[in-house]
Amino acid sequence: MNDLTLQKARAYEAEHGAAISPAERPAYHLTPYVGWLNDPNGFSYYKGKYHQFYQYNPYDVRWAPMHWGHAVSTDLLHWEYLPCALAPDSPADNGPGCFSGSATEMDDGRQLLMYTSVIAEKQPNGEMRDIQTQSIAIGDGLDYEKPACNPVLTQKDLPEGFSKFDFRDPKIWREADGTYSAVTVCLAEDGSGAAALFQSKDGFDWHFVTVLERCNNQYGKMWECPDFFPLDGKQVLMLGPMEMLPKGEFHNGHNVIAFIGSYDEATHTFTRENVQLMDGGIDFYATQTTLAPDGRRIMTAWLQTWSDTEDKPQGCKWFGQTICPRELHIKDGRILQAPVRELDAVHGKRTFHENVTVQSETALEGIKGRVADLTVTVQSGEYRSFTLKLAADADHYTSLVYDPYTSELTLDRSYAGSRADIVHRRSCKVRSQNGALKLRILLDKNSIEVFANDGEQTMTAWIYTPQSADGITFAADGKAIITAEQFELNL
């Protein structure tokens, strides 16, 4: 690789990334080698390892012209950093950079990356606007070359009336016959998002096939980060609407939603049957899935949202992380999520308390910590609310509060230590079970991931609470009977 822009990024990250100790990072969540991370990209299994690229600015802990960071793992928990994969260094992407995309394997064994290439273009009125096109890069899992044919998709490939300013985030895969398919999002003529399908025989020469789904100003405005995949006999179109209005389980702003339905491969027709929110917490966006060698559909996401990216720990050396990857399944027409089973393999010391009666705030021996896998089951009781406090000390805590009368679960990090005027509290409905509730909670220093009732609902949030705040307590307004099981993690 001879390009100076890429070599500069690689030299910088090698020097400064190595200066960040493991103790300064989460234990099992991917963070940038150095600097800034947002959307996970190119999540794939290639040459015996999981690859996770990511939107990346190595030079600062804030967004800037986008590179692609790169890490690999054999177990989705321990990540090895590889050198920066892409930099904004070609005529197609030398403006704001190499935006989000994906990866697949070619017939000759090379890896094909497809990404949104962005350049600034002067408009007839003199205004400079970013033009979004799709480009490719081909490599061996370490080094990637951008062919001279870039970009491979432009506005001319879109239906009439679709915007060249909002055309991005290709998710690529191979069909059974070897055809390359990719779904992108674009802004339709009505000013709201659409998901468009493109195909290619060789990965270089692409053509428009159809519009799979339209927003019609019903689910936010512009869409981002689409994915399209089969799951348990259904077809799923997953994406991130921007500027959502609150309705039902959806909240204001950025969401991740899944359209679940059927797909006719002969006519390329997707028929929607159900729509659901993928996470009811505070920090969850930019999902992407891959198919594991054993057939599992595994999802990653950015453990962040755009509205709170300015709330950073003072002096931080990195910013942004991805979730613990999740396995997806469909039950009763809805997607269930569970932490990847690889997490079970690192379970260490087990602490177990059974049939504990909880009234006033109570701590249980051995149940504490900031890196743990905790399952709490509220079995029964007469109570008006049940409260679980995490990452707690005299001044800090993040709470989960369950109201059995409304079946509402609330995640609240108002006292986690942030001084920012941002969203700190969200609620979601869980299935009513006469007061019973099961919560699996993943703690990893700066984050909390909650799986309610075996992943029927999830809630995710970052917390920048001092690591010394490691208390966990239980309380009920009334009387609740609980079981708690915690595993330390050997990482």
What are the language-model segments listed below?
Residues 10-15, 257-491:
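Beta-rich accessory regions
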